[in-house]
Amino acid sequence: MKYLIVLYAYVLNPLLNLIPIAWIDIFYDNMTHVGNAMHHPYYLIAWATSTAVGLFVSSLLIWRKYKISYSLGLHFLLCSGWILSCCIPYSVDLPGWINDAHVWIAIACTIGFSLEWLILYTKKESFIYSEIKTLLYVLQFVFLICFGTLASAGHVNALCEMLYSISVNGVLAAFVLRFVL
């Protein structure tokens, strides 16, 4: 199990995230551009699936180990929302509501996932274990950096998406490897 987590978090997911560097300007374009305008929809879905599965599984492993209450249905909905968002095409030729659905599902799921972790600050069971407290501080810092990347560009770009996918998955995987397994 440890081998699979290392392979996923530190090889497969980063490689999937770094591929667009050869295709687009990661400071301007986003992953949707790769999937729709550049006609690589299977890459886009693979990227979203990789990100979502890693975040879903790592979170569950941590929450179960430390007996932190969570909503499995909500967590599944938030993580699978990224995949759903990437399956909805984005194009100027499509009705605006389709493009809006693509964008707002992705935004809602990203914010929702981040809030799932940040809300743990309000739960007393989160502070029983010092390692969970440390994880929350590290995740808060990572979320802040990701938001800073978004704010500095003024829009969602591939760098922001790649940074969130690699860093949050990496932090959660490192925690799972060190404290859970």
Model-derived segments and their meaning:
Residues 36, 94-107, 157-166:
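Non-cytosolic membrane-interface motifs at loop->transmembrane helix junctions
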Residues 124-181:
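Terminal transmembrane helical module of multi-pass membrane proteins
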Residues 14-18, 78-87, 140-151:
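Aromatic-anchored segments of alpha-helical transmembrane domains
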Residues 1-68:
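N-terminal topogenic module of multi-pass integral membrane proteins
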Residues 8-16, 44-58, 108-119, 165-180:
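Hydrophobic cores of alpha-helical transmembrane segments in multi-pass inner/ER membrane proteins
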